Amino acid sequence: METLQFDLTKEYGKFKPLNATNGGPWHKRFTKKMVRSNYEEYKAARIPYSRNHDLAVHTVYGGPYCHDISCIFPNFDANPYDPKSYDFGCTDEEILTTLEAGTKTFFRLGQTIENQIVKHNTFPPKDFKKWAVICEHIIRHYNY
């Protein structure tokens, strides 16, 4: 392994931030029983970017109720034009907390892979046009 060395007597200019995360900070704002929070440390780290890939497996963000299309739109037989068909609660909170900590979010629009024996939500949709409408409404929600 190579060692990165600097001559501190020379000026090199600004360093590009290289730190980023998958998932934002843990915050106790709405989860008072949460054992721990890393919000202040996360904010102090000044992390420029975070993505929310496969966060449905992390209970701290809402577990099976956040980020995946099947979590945000849990009943595929529901009307995709009815705002009541969508559950943005946990996903909104994770994104809001991340933004409040000063971190920009890369939103992953998709579905968490299921490596278990039984698959529940990783099958192709039964109606691709409806799936596209659902995706469109999720994108619109986060680009208001």
Regions found by a protein language model. Give the residues of each.
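Non-catalytic accessory regions flanking glycosidase/transglycosidase catalytic cores in CAZymes
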Residues: 1-144
